[in-house]
């Protein structure tokens, strides 16, 4: 299941993201963050972290460098 989610995100990056204007306010981008969070923390926690990150990615948030935290 983890592999499927990561492949879906990679598909988004290859096929959909180039069509849309750049809009992510963070480094790494939200899709890169989601892939890394899912790979590092698993499906449930990684997806929850990615959703929270995407909810913060809006014009009123300053953005900036926000890496996936290390696993404890």
Curated annotation (Swiss-Prot):
The keyword Disulfide bond does not apply. Coiled coil: none annotated. It holds the Pfam family YidD. Signal peptide: none annotated. GO terms for cellular component: plasma membrane. Disulfide bonds: none annotated. It comes from the Bacteria. Keywords: Cell inner membrane, Cell membrane, Membrane. It is found in: Cell inner membrane. The keyword Cell inner membrane applies. Its main location: membrane. It is a peripheral membrane protein. Could be involved in insertion of integral membrane proteins into the membrane. Belongs to the UPF0161 family. PANTHER family: MEMBRANE PROTEIN INSERTION EFFICIENCY FACTOR-RELATED. This is Putative membrane protein insertion efficiency factor. It comes from Trichodesmium erythraeum (strain IMS101). The lineage of its organism: Bacteria, Bacillati, Cyanobacteriota, Cyanophyceae, Oscillatoriophycideae.
